[in-house]
């Protein structure tokens, strides 16, 4: 089926086919209340648009603002919206444009195709499948006869909240019992609900926005609608999962957020990181339930059909069945494949990634933002192909979705505020804690309303009642420990045919959908009939709004919310006229609107001590520098402690920033963490349910030998499954009770740090307004303030990174060291009972089994059940920390006492110990593995010195390790031939030193009497990034690793004192080549001996990132040109082969070219052929990632597969230079890195012309051409790659090669 989108205007005439007068499916008077009929437009086959407000589920028949507060803090109401013909036409055009955007990508077209073709299972009448009101809409013909047309989806305008979107299945039972049902969507293409990425993955955004930016983004209405379309798909297939959900505990603590239950259907539909919290047991039940439902429907409905018709032909395609009329059976394998695709591949996050749309990280918003309006019909604001991120408008890197864009109009939510009041239990508990100006001024007599420049004004507590108001969205979200309802861990008696569900059977996450073929699309029957069957059941009627209960709670002490309020500045304060003072007294800040609480003493002193009216730019600049330094130093501070035989890097100011831990150790947050662990961070320490298992049982009776053996094996496998299920339930409880609280703490931390930065901003603006120097300097100072704000925001980001590391490690520790061991105790009892059962069973069947087999099975049972199944740490949904923190690297970093690297264009110690660094004038920064690397050159002034301190001093008994990345250029001359020159040393007759000689790295460790020397093989000579790790166990040995592989070990037990007071010096000492240089990145020193496992993990962390890397190891970049070579044919690059007769040029490999090193070694030339441009990106940092879809351009022409000349299995790669020859130009780039090699593969997507393939090469002679190395897409390689000998089959491995100063071919 070729999907077509019909174009309409609202005033188009009724034609009875695509434009009708529709009777609303919800025609019940109870729900509809006489609404309609409405004009409806069939925009896609079986998909209709009705430009009317969706108001069928509103019991009050009222679109006005609710008279009571609701939980949705970002709702907006306008009862007059979508009333006029012009508004209805605008809505119609808006929805059509969004659908066209969805259709613009193959995945979106597949989704629309699936919805268009997915007719719900009809009823049976007179032996034939017959449509009912569950699959059709009714319309009024000119002769007043009511007829019916097929409809799978009806898209309406928004409901009461004009920025909200929702999906409703018409009937409640069919959405989940396998039948399926027509769906209605209420959709708002012009009114959107923004989201923020306060502590998300896209941190580099502040580098491209020249202002203090709140990272608030507008959703693309295409991704919003696709979310609803996924729900529609679930409804049409009858697999909507509404029986599994999290209930949120609103009564455990008084500061709990009021929140509706979160059904797992929403997590599956949204996808992303939170969907990882869904237990595999629940996934198993979802799949089993769907299979059981479909099996029942086939048996009880489909097999009662006796008449063949078009509907039956269609249903046999939609539901994979085997057999003949009256005896159909479910094709389980095909059904599971389709089910896995619809449930686990189709989701908003996956689809948004394919469309290069930024979506929020979590399904639940931590901070709802007021809605916005945008005219998406303006092609300069929103395009069909790129949405808001229009590259020609300069909106790359998601900048087009930033709320600061001019086309977004912010609209303040007009719903009543949902908040609680927190009041002191005793009226005089503290001095006037409520000082929010918008509230206290309403309660003060006019004669008391005075304006003063002094900052010590206070108001009596009796006047202000001492209460603060806290928004519902800021309260703690905690899941009920029993919210995983309907979890039944019991098992039937084990039989020979018992099946076992394992996690590794879950579907692969192929988000391209390119290999999924929904065959029912080719057999959609087109049926119009006047008489349809009516279902005798209640229509599904959702709840309109979630009402919020305003309450007052009374406290005896200050809370986190008081501390947050004390850091807030009222919006009414004019920063040009009123100076905001920072204070370390929460009481003062709460009682005075011109004071802000801050725990950062140095920064506060710098802010407060400067006189009003700075007189020169020099003083102003120095003041700004001091602010940045103080704020960066104080927010970057960490304390390292040992807890539970582990090392933890604590962010010490979190306690005084948010009033955490005082119940445990007042004023000593670090001590509180050391004593209580994560419980010091939690508002509520939850109980969790430890699942109780009864030992497995087996069937008895007459059994054959093979059946007995099968029962034992199935029981052992089922035991493993039960362990996995219990682990997953425990993980889900942790996510709901611990992880969600940590998310709230992180949101509070970000809010507090942002308010600290805002207080600084207000002071800078005040000083600028009152500047007493040369008036012409103000513009320069304003620019300096803007730059300062960016640096402050980066300090906030770094502080959040430290906080995330700290909190997630505690959270992980609680799961693995508190929860899991308790669960394992019960599981061991379960194993004991199971073992007794199996031993007894085997003994009873010994006469069937024989002595040898009986003994073997008992031994097998004993071995399996005496071995615990480890909890997989990688199964934890580490959400927002994925690209910041690798669990293993995090543990290593806690011992890190030096990390010399580059950040924000400066060389600094990134370890948190803030070493004193002196940098020579000829030290430079260059492109590195991730960001910037340090370039040490051959000149005398290219030197870095790090002063000795207590962290870097190692006694004769102190173990330590050194690890660093090095990129050493290939030699261009023989000046250093045979010369050893130093790279870095802490050496003065004794100490340690790292040198280079003939491209080999040398490690020295020496005291006054003894020394060792280890020389690496020739691994660092060829300009690629290599990880060198040197570990030292003072009682054993020193080991050198290269790229995680152990090179050599030497005994150092006889080496004693190696301490020197000299600095650590980086320089190319004794180097003879003034043009020589070396790049270093992340030079780290650890106060421990890293074991081999940690070294390997440290190296693998580099490859665990999803960056695609060029041949040197640097991240691949969009909009940059590269040479391309295949691993199979070094020295041959890509070129175009002109062939005009077909309007099509082939891409082939060039002739081979070699270069010779100064030492007479020959290599294939890397800079050969034509450069290839990687086109387009909506990535914030412009970097290419695994599974990205890229476009390649050679000589200014797109590369791809021509539709004019194709073969299903083998297709030549070419370009077009005309406008009539289409190319399939998308390549999916796949990460295939190995040690020392940074290659990738380029996958061409499946379409009607060709199968998916891998770009490869082949020496052949096509018709009319010579023998050449042709470049083509091979379906065979794609299908067989995983099973090939990869040392022999390297034709599909491609290197991207940029020109690099470390590799000279001139």
UniProtKB/Swiss-Prot annotation:
Question: Which InterPro entries does the record match to this protein?
Answer: Bot/tetX_LC (IPR000395), Clostridium_toxin_transloc (IPR036248), ConA-like_dom_sf (IPR013320), Kunitz_inhibitor_STI-like_sf (IPR011065), Toxin_rcpt-bd_C (IPR013104), Toxin_rcpt-bd_N (IPR012928), Toxin_trans (IPR012500)
- Translocation domain (TD): region residues: 462-889
Placement of sequence motif Host ganglioside-binding motif: 1274-1277
Q: Where is the active site?
A: 228
Cofactor binding, per record: Binds 1 zinc ion per subunit.
- Record-annotated disulphide pairs: 423-467
Region entry C-terminus of receptor binding domain (C-RBD), spans:
1104-1306
Cofactor annotation: Zn(2+)
Q: Where is this region: Belt?
A: 505-555
Residues bound to Zn(2+):
227, 231, 266
Its PTM note reads: An interchain disulfide bond is required for toxin stability in an artificial construct with the light chain and translocation domain; which of Cys-461 or Cys-467 forms the disulfide bond with Cys-423 in vivo is unknown.
Additional facts recorded: There are seven antigenically distinct forms of botulinum neurotoxin: Types A, B, C, D, E, F, and G; new subtypes are quite frequent. This toxin is not recognized or neutralized by any of the antisera against the standard serotypes.
Q: Which family does it belong to?
A: Belongs to the peptidase M27 family.
Query: Quaternary structure?
Result: Heterodimer; disulfide-linked heterodimer of a light chain (LC) and heavy chain (HC).
Q: What is this protein called?
A: Botulinum neurotoxin type X
**What is the protein's species of origin?**
Clostridium botulinum
């Amino acid at each position: 089926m070729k999907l077509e989108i019909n174009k309409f205007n609202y005033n188009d005439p009724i034609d009875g086919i695509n434009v009708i007068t529709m009777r609303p499916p919800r025609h019940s008077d109870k729900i509809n209340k006489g609404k309609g009929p409405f004009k409806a437009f069939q925009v896609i086959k079986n998909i209709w648009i009705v430009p009317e407000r969706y108001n069928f589920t509103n019991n009050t028949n009222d679109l006005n603002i609710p008279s009571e507060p609701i939980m949705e803090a970002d709702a907006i109401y306008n009862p007059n919206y979508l009333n006029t013909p012009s508004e209805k036409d605008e809505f119609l055009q808006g929805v059509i444009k969004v659908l066209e955007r969805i259709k613009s990508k193959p995945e979106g077209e597949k989704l629309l195709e699936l919805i268009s073709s997915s007719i719900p299972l009809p009823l049976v009448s007179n032996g034939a499948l017959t449509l009912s009101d569950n699959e059709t809409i009714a319309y009024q013909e000119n002769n007043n006869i009511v007829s019916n047309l097929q409809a799978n989806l009806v898209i309406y305008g928004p409901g009461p909240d004009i920025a909200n979107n929702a999906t409703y299945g018409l009937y409640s039972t069919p959405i989940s019992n396998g039948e399926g049902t027509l769906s209605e969507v209420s959709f708002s293409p012009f009114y959107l609900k923004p989201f923020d990425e306060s502590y998300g993955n896209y941190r580099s955004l502040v580098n491209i926005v020249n202002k203090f930016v709140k990272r608030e983004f507008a959703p693309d209405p295409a991704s919003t609608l696709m979310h609803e379309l996924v729900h529609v798909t679930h409804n049409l297939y009858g697999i909507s999962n509404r029986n599994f959900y999290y209930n949120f505990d609103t009564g455990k603590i008084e500061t709990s957020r009021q929140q509706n239950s979160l059904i797992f259907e929403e997590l599956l539909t949204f996808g992303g990181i939170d969907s990882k919290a869904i237990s595999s047991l629940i996934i198993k039940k979802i799949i089993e339930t769907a299979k059981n439902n479909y099996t029942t429907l086939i048996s009880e409905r489909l097999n009662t059909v006796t008449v063949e018709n078009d509907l039956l032909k269609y249903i046999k395609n939609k539901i994979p069945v085997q057999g003949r009329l009256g005896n159909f059976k479910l094709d389980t394998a095909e059904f599971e494949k389709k089910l896995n695709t619809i449930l686990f591949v189709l989701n908003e996050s996956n689809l948004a990634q394919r469309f290069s749309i930024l979506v929020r990280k979590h399904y639940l918003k931590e901070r709802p933002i007021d809605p916005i309006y945008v005219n998406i019909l303006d092609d300069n604001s929103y395009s069909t192909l790129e949405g808001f991120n229009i590259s020609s408008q300069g909106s790359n890197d998601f900048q087009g979705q930033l709320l600061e864009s001019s086309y977004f109009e912010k609209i303040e939510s007009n719903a009543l505020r949902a908040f609680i009041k927190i009041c002191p239990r005793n009226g005089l508990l503290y001095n006037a804690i409520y000082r929010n100006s918008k509230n206290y001024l309403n309660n003060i007599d006019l004669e008391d309303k005075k304006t003063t420049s002094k900052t010590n004004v206070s108001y009596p507590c009796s006047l202000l009642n001492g209460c603060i108001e806290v928004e519902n969205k800021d309260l703690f979200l905690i899941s009920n420990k029993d919210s995983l309802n309907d979890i039944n861990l019991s098992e039937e008696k084990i039989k020979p045919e018992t099946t076992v569900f394992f996690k590794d059977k879950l579907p692969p996450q192929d988000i391209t959908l390119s290999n999924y073929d929904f065959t029912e699309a080719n057999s959609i029957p087109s049926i119009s009939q006047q008489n349809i069957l009516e279902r005798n059941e209640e229509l599904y009627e959702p709840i309109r709004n979630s009402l919020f209960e305003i309450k007052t709670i009374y406290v005896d002490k200050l809370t986190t919310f008081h501390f947050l309020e004390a850091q807030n500045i009222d919006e009414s304060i004019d920063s040009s006229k009123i100076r905001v003072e920072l204070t370390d007294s929460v009481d003062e800040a709460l009682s005075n609107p011109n004071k802000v609480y801050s725990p950062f003493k140095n920064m506060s002193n710098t802010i407060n001590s400067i006189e009003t009216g700075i007189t020169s730019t020099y003083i102003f600049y120095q003041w700004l520098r001091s602010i940045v330094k103080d704020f960066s130093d104080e927010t970057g501070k960490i304390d390292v402690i040992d807890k539970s035989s582990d090392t933890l890097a604590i962010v010490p100011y979190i306690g005084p920033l948010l009033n955490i831990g005082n119940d445990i150790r007042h004023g000593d947050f670090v001590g509180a963490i050391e004593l209580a662990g994560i419980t010091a961070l939690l508002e509520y320490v939850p109980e969790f349910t430890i699942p109780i298992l009864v030992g497995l049982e087996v069937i008895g009776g007459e059994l054959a030998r093979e059946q007995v053996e099968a029962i034992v094996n199935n029981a052992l496998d089922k035991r493993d499954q039960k362990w996995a299920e219990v682990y997953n339930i425990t993980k889900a409880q942790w996510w709901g009770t611990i992880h969600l609280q940590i998310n709230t703490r992180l949101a509070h931390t970000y809010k507090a740090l942002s308010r600290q930065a805002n207080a600084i901003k207000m002071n800078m603006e005040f000083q600028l307004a009152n500047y007493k120097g040369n008036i012409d300097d103000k513009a320069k100072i304003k620019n300096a303030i803007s730059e300062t704000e960016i640096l402050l925001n980066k300090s906030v980001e770094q502080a959040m990174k430290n906080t995330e590391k700290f909190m997630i490690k505690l959270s992980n520790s609680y799961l693995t060291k508190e929860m899991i061991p308790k669960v394992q105790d019960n599981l061991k009892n379960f194993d004991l009972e199971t073992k007794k059962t199996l031993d007894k069973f085997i003994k009873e069947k010994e006469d069937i089994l024989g002595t040898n087999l009986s003994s073997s099975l008992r031994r097998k049972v004993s071995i399996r059940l005496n071995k615990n199944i480890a909890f997989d740490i990688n199964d934890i949904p580490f959400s927002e920390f994925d690209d910041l923190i690798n669990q293993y690297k995090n543990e290593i970093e806690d011992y890190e006492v030096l990390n010399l690297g580059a950040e924000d264009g400066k060389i600094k110690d990134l370890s948190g110990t803030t070493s004193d660094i002196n940098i020579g004038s000829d030290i430079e920064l260059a492109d590195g593995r991730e960001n910037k690397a340090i370039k040490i050159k051959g000149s005398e002034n290219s030197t870095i010195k790090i002063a000795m301190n207590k962290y870097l001093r190692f006694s004769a008994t102190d173990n330590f390790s050194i690890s660093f990345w090095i990129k050493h250029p290939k030699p261009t001359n023989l000046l250093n031939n045979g010369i050893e020159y130093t790279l870095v040393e802490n050496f003065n007759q004794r100490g340690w030193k790292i040198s280079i000689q003939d491209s080999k790295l040398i490690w020295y460790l020496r005291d006054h009497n003894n020394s060792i020397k280890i020389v690496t093989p020739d691994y660092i000579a060829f300009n690629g990034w290599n990880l060198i790790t040197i570990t030292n166990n003072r009682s054993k040995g020193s080991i050198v690793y290269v790229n995680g592989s152990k090179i050599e070990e030497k005994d150092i037990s006889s080496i004693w004192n190696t301490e020197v007071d000299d600095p650590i010096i980086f320089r190319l000492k004794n180097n003879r080549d003034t043009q020589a240089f070396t790049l270093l990145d992340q030079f780290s020193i650890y106060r421990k001996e890293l074991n081999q496992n940690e070294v390997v993990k440290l190296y693998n962390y580099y490859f665990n990132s999803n960056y695609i890397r060029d041949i040197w190891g640097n991240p691949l970049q969009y909009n940059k040109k590269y040479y391309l070579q295949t691993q199979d044919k070094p020295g041959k690059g890509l070129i175009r082969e002109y062939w005009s007769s077909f309007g099509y040029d082939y891409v082939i490999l060039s002739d081979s070219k070699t270069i010779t090193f100064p030492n007479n070694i020959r290599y294939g030339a890397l800079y050969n052929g034509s450069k290839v441009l990687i086109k387009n990106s909506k990535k914030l940092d412009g970097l290419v990632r695994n599974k990205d879809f890229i476009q390649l351009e050679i000589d200014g022409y797109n590369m791809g597969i021509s539709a004019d000349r194709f073969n299903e299995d083998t297709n030549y790669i070419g370009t077009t230079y005309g406008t009539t020859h289409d190319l399939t130009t998308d390549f999916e780039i796949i990460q295939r890195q190995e040690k020392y090699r940074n290659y990738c593969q380029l996958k061409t997507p499946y379409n009607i012309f060709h199968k998916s393939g891998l770009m490869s090469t082949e020496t052949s002679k096509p018709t009319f051409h010579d023998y050449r190395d042709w470049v083509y897409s091979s379906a065979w390689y794609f299908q067989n790659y995983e099973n090939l000998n990869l040392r022999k089959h390297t034709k599909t491995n491609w290197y991207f090669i940029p020109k690099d100063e470390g590799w000279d071919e001139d």
